[in-house]
Each structure stands twice: as C-alpha cells, then as structure tokens.
Amino acid sequence: MAETTEVVTEAKKEEKEADHHPYYRPKDAATLILVDRSGSVPKVLVGKRHDKVVFMPGKFVFPGGRVDKADNRVPVTAPIPQELEANLLKGSPKIEASRAKSLAIAAIREACEETGLCLGRKSDGAKGKLDGAWKPFAEAGLLPDPSGLFLIARAITPPGRVRRFDTRFFTADASAITHRVEGVIHPDAELVELVWVEIGSKPLADLHPMTRNVLGELEKRLATGPLRHDAAVPFFHFYGGKMRKDVLGEASLATKEA
C-alpha cells in the first residue's frame, strides 16, 4: 500500500507541474544507470546538468536521451541478449527487433556522449566501422557491447508536456566500463559533474520524481541478488488522467493516452 501511495503522490506532482501543451507523441529514449556494487552499499553514477539547459537544468540525472535513426545499424560485438530483446518487445505499441536494438544501443551511445564512459569490447575492425557519435569507440578500437544491459523500467512522460519521452531505463554493472574519454565533463558541457552516489543517500532525493520511482525499482532488484532478465519490469504511464504502474507484458489497458 505504501508503494501505491507513493506512486499516486508522485503522479499528483507530475500533474501539478504539467504545462498542458497540446498533444505530442512521445519520442523513444533510453537511459543508462551504471551501478558499482564493489562496496557494502551499491552506488549509482549521476551527472549534474548544466543550469542553462532547457530540460531539468541543474538537476542530477542519469545519462540518457533520444534514440537516433542510425542506432540500429551500429555494429556491435554480439547481438543484444535474447532475454533483453524479449523484454523490450513487450508492451504497446508493438515494435520490431531492430527498434529493440536501437533502444539498447542508444543507452550505450548516450552514456558515452554525456559521461565519456564506454561499454564496449576490442575489435580489429572498429576503426573502419564507426564514426560520428561513435568516434570515441573507434579511436579506442572498441565496438559497443550490449551484453551487460538489463531493462529495469519503462516510463512515458504524461500528456500535456511539450517534451515527452517513452523511456526505457537500463542498468549495467560498472565493471562493463572498458574505456573513459577525457574532457567530456567540464563547466560548459551538458553534464558538469559526475558523482558515484550510494543508493538511498540524500543527493538522490532531488532526482526527478519518476526517476526516483525507477531507482526504487532498481534498489529492490539489487537487494535480491544478481540482476536477472526474468524479473518483472514495471511500466509507468498515464491512463484516464491517472498514473498507472503496470508490468510489461501484463498490462490490462492499452496506452491510448500515451
């Protein structure tokens, strides 16, 4: 009951903050939560956004952003795990396997772009296959490696917002980081600071309400032991003017208002 009350409370906050813009279809997006479990209390990597950016200025966030059209064409070290693909294909609207790959690869790309941290594996052909946003991978002789990703949650920004996202939240262990690009974090960057923060600590209390909900789901998953693909994946979305928390693959209502 306490969990339900918290979700309802956060939904009311979302409605209060809403600008009530005309309907905008949410854009696919991906977020990556990196976890360090080397200590007694797990830590997650958060970045502080520049105070001049449009979306959530000055807030602590997890790296993430919109899916690019080219993400599904990026060469990888191996296909995304079948169990991960199955989770990404659950829910409505139905998507193709190529879109599932795009979501997973977007999470890796955004993490590299915003934090300089690369999840990849060595490949002799990397330099000739990657360019643009993937240049740091090519220079390090890496191809992106999605094998360590797990889907934690899906959340859709409520109607009435000018910026709406259909976000898949992924997590990966810090041990999956194989390369760091220097100079990505600086005073004029999108993220001006990176911090490893213990789950449950005060700095995380200022996260966006929906992000706190997702982090709470991750904390529960971590408490049960190693991450598994067969765990239930929550889906936060609005239906009938109210926020719902369903389970992907088990939702009883279509997301007509998404």
Question: What function would you assign to each model-found segment?
Answer:
Residues M1-A258:
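N-terminal leader/linker segments that precede catalytic domains of diphosphate-processing enzymes
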